[in-house]
Amino acid sequence: VQVGTHFAVTRESDAHINFKRVLAEAGPEDIVTFMSAEGLPARAVLTPWLKRYLGREEGLRARATPDKAHCGRQVECLTFCGLKDGNGSAGQFCIETQLAAAQRGDVNLGLFFRGSESLPFGREIRSVHELLTYLLSGIRPTTPEPA
């Protein structure tokens, strides 16, 4: 069971408020599956950047070859990276750049990974205490705790 998104959208999370809102407000129709830069299937919220990328993905992957490989940031953040290695079976984007944008709360440029399951409190941003109460007991608090 993966519950990272549940904790990322709590009040106590140090994530940018836009980061929390993008994850909390995404409905099932907003979440897409695509090929990550690591070559693994990934789910994320369909943001403006991801929509643009997916429109170009097929062509980018078709043109990817080791002789055209490049890492513009030179950060070597991944051992295997479709962009850095020129591997067309993987995504052709800089994951470090897109995740950094998401961390800053940049909804237009960020990549916001998110599971497909609904969140325990829907679109509400609740406390860690409420989340743990729900996860451990199955009891969903009806009214939010005071901030």
Task: Describe each model-derived feature in a short phrase.
Residues 1-147:
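Conserved active-site-proximal phosphate/metal-binding subdomains
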